């Protein structure tokens, strides 16, 4: 008994640490704008990897201490082994394989980026950023899945999911009401193709499309959770409460407290049941309102497709889903019409009153509809469903009439993305198997673009992976998505709609540039594991039958590939019970110490040590990047040139891979020092258009026209639709020619003038070609400028004189 308690204490401590890390990731994703800007993530990543290293050290030291003291196996809640009663060995094996793929692919992606980083990528800085990101994703996936199969961690996973969704939605809605100050929570546009009202809700993510997709994920998770709950028979309260994760954990507790035997207990039970039901419906209205106010057509469409696909499979959920969503959707549509008419800018008091009134109405009406749908029969139930369908229809008409022009009219954004995709495919063909490293499109789109558009994001997550890691990386991602979908379909089909939103919406937007989407993607299977575990723990057991029929099956640990004994009927300890003679299952996400140091144990120790060392390495790397970013920001704010130089040099000392730091410092140094610094930076970013142009400018200010022309050509090869560069290059060659002629060097002077004329002719040719294609997609306004015409006259006059 003493050993058992100590083992449970060790596992609980690890579960609390992992849960704290899951909370940290959720908070960081919400506060750091969805983890989009890597530069502002560096301090968070440093803290994250230090905590991961500490957690792994604690685990290794704790398990080692118990092994030396002869302690028993660390008991824990069974995970993917033996969670289903009467499950066949093939099902368990398939589940383990899916979980193993889910946890292994992020490590494979991380390894591919490490390989690129070592062999010289297109951008060393971009590849380092992706390494840090995937280190975060891989560790988060492992931690959240471990928490999901532990009783303590399971509650943390569920509650943190719900709190993250509520925080994102409520912060955006309160910003609209003027209660919370978020500078970029509302996006403005004068184009009717971008917004029907000129304003769209972007929330903490500061991008309406991504924000809408996130809200669709949270909305469908909760909507289908409520539909599953009210779609089952009224009995089995405990099991149904367990199936509703997130706020459903509190609902299950409230319903367990609601069991009473008349009198005061019966009244308290009724109140507890109502409270649980209200908690279950609570997030639907803010999620729906935020989704509608984002005015994201892609999020709306993917949410509708995901719902339709799952409802075709689970048709018994249609009626409860109609009842659960009718009131929140209708109230959210009314709020959308009111706030859109006001330009998403209302006074705090009227806005809060409107928000609170509609929310309360949606809660009460939704509760009534759900209960009537569950208890009524015959004509009454048909009337109730007709009323719910009318609510959905009215809400849809109200919203669609408001945005019909955006939906039915031509869309420049759709054609622009088609242009992005064509250019991206051509770029991907240059390195089809392994890609060109991290952030390839961001650093190469200027060279790859066939029109002068502005788009540092390719607006397709799969193409982005293809550009970075080639078909090898894309195949790994697709395999992980298939494994995740299979795991959700077998463990919790109601989680398929939010998963499908992530998978589908990333086809048309750059969702995967936000770290939050990857966290949600790994969070969903953890929720499925947690729900499945809670469901089977809540199921009734029969001790006598367990004693007579000690069912045992051999299963495989998905992380260590160690065979363990699994009993699907008992989930208490891995030790043998002397009274029942039944061997109980093991936790697949924790290594179990044994007195003998077997090869498997040594392998697990090696893996744990590797994880610890790799976390430490990534932590050091992110700390260096954070220090470099800190000194760079200080240098930008400084007005003293000498202080600027000192701070920029310190920044480069911490992170020599940053091109913008090199460019800023090179402009403050002398000619030779500047050229040397820029050449050195090209080793980290060999095809950086800005670095090539800086070198061209340095050589144009010297007496080396040949070197100047070389770097001008390099710069235009990497960025040809740049008016300012063409004008400066032509002017630079003109000034060099004038200087050479004034010095009496007629030959070199005429060569410079002729080179300027050639540049001018090429510039005019490109500008005429672009003008013939029309103004659409000419976001950079590439055209012949008045300054270029003036330079043409000056070159002609100089050529006539000599």
Model-derived features: where do they sit?
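A juxtamembrane structural motif centered on a specific transmembrane helix
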Residues: 2-15, 235-239, 274, 330-336, ...
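Membrane-interfacial, low-structure loops and terminal tails that flank and connect transmembrane helices
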Residues: 2-11, 66-98, 230-279, 374-381, ...
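Alpha-helical transmembrane segments of multi-pass inner-membrane proteins
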Residues: 2-33, 47-59, 110-117, 129-143, ...
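Extracytoplasmic loop-helix module adjacent to an early transmembrane segment
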Residues: 47, 51, 183-192, 411-431
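Transmembrane alpha-helix boundary signature
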Residues: 57-71, 95-98, 114-126, 176, ...
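TM-adjacent membrane-interface loops and short helices in multi-pass inner/ER membrane proteins
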Residues: 207, 418-456, 462-465, 469-476
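Hydrophobic alpha-helical transmembrane segments in integral membrane proteins
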Residues: 397-416, 605-642
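C-terminal luminal/periplasmic domains and tails of membrane-associated envelope-modifying transferases
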Residues: 631-802
């Amino acid at each position: 008994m003493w050993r058992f308690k100590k083992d449970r204490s060790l596992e609980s401590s690890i579960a609390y640490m992992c849960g704290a890390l899951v909370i940290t990731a959720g908070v960081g994703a919400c506060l750091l704008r969805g983890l989009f800007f890597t530069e502002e993530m560096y301090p968070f990543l440093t803290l994250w990897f230090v905590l991961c290293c500490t957690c792994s050290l604690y685990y290794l030291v704790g398990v080692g201490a118990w092994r030396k003291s002869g302690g028993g196996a660390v008991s824990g809640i069974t995970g993917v082994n033996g969670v289903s009663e009467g499950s066949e060995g093939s099902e368990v094996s398939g589940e383990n394989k899916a979980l193993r793929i889910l946890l292994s692919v992020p490590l494979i992606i991380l390894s591919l980026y490490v390989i690129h980083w070592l062999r010289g990528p297109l951008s060393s800085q971009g590849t380092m950023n992706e390494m840090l990101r995937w280190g975060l994703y891989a560790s988060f996936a492992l931690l959240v899945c471990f928490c999901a199969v532990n009783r303590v961690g399971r509650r943390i996973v569920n509650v943190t999911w719900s709190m993250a969704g509520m925080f994102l939605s409520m912060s955006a809605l309160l910003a609209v009401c003027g209660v919370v100050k978020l500078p970029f929570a509302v996006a403005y546009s004068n184009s009717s193709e971008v917004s029907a009202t000129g304003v769209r809700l972007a929330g903490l993510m500061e991008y309406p499309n991504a924000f809408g997709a996130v809200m669709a994920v949270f909305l469908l998770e909760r909507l289908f959770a409520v539909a599953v709950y009210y779609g089952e028979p009224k009995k089995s309260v405990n099991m149904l409460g367990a199936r509703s994760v997130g706020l459903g954990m509190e609902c299950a507790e409230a319903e367990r407290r609601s069991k009473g035997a008349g009198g005061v207990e019966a009244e308290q039970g009724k109140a507890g049941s109502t409270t649980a039901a209200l908690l279950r419906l609570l997030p639907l209205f803010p999620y729906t309102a935020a989704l509608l106010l984002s005015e994201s057509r892609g999020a709306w469409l993917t949410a509708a497709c995901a719902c339709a696909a799952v409802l075709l499979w689970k048709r018994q959920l249609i009626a409860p889903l109609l009842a659960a969503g009718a009131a929140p959707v209708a109230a959210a549509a009314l709020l959308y019409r009111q706030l859109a008419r006001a330009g998403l800018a209302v006074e705090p008091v009227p806005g809060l009153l409107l928000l609170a009134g509609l929310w309360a109405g949606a809660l009460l009406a939704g509760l009534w509809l759900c209960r009537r749908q569950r208890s009524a029969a015959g004509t009454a139930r048909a009337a109730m469903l007709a009323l719910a369908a009318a609510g959905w229809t009215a809400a849809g008409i109200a919203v669609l009439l408001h945005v019909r022009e955006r939906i039915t009219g031509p869309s420049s954004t759709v054609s622009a993305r088609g242009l992005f995709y064509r250019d991206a495919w051509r770029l991907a063909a240059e390195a089809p198997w392994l890609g060109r490293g991290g952030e390839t499109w961001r650093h190469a789109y200027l060279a790859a673009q066939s029109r002068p558009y502005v788009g540092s994001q390719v607006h397709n997550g799969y193409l982005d992976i293809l550009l970075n890691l080639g078909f090898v990386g894309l195949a790994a991602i697709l395999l992980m998505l298939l494994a995740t979908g299979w795991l959700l379909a077998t463990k919790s089909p109601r989680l398929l709609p939010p998963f499908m939103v992530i998978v589908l919406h990333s086809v048309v937007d750059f969702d995967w540039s936000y770290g939050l989407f990857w966290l949600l993607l790994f969070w969903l299977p953890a929720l499925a594991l947690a729900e499945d575990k809670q469901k089977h723990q809540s199921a009734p057991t029969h001790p006598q039958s367990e004693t007579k029929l000690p069912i045992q099956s051999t299963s495989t640990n998905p992380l260590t590939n160690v065979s363990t004994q699994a009993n699907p009927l008992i989930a208490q300890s891995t030790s043998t019970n002397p009274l029942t003679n039944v061997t109980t299952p093991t936790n697949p996400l924790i290594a179990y110490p044994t007195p003998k140091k077997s090869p498997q144990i040594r392998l697990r120790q090696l893996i744990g040590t590797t994880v610890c060392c790799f976390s430490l390495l990534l932590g050091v790397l992110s700390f260096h990047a954070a220090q470099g970013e800190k000194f760079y920001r200080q240098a930008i704010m400084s007005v003293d040139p000498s202080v600027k130089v000192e701070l920029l040099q310190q920044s480069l000392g911490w992170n020599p891979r940053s091109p913008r730091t090199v460019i800023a410092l090179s402009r403050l140094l002398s000619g030779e020092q500047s050229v040397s610094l820029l050449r050195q930076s090209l080793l980290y970013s060999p095809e950086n258009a800005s670095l090539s142009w800086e070198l061209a400018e340095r050589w144009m200010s010297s007496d080396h026209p040949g070197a100047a022309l070389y770097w001008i050509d390099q710069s235009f090869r990497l960025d040809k639709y740049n008016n300012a560069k063409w004008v400066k290059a032509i002017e630079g060659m003109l000034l060099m020619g004038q200087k050479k002629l004034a010095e009496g060097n007629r030959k070199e002077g005429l060569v410079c003038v002729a080179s300027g004329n050639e540049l001018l002719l090429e510039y005019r040719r490109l500008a005429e070609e672009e003008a013939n294609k029309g103004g659409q997609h000419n976001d950079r306004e590439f055209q012949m400028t008045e300054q270029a015409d003036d330079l043409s006259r000056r070159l002609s006059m100089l050529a006539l004189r000599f």
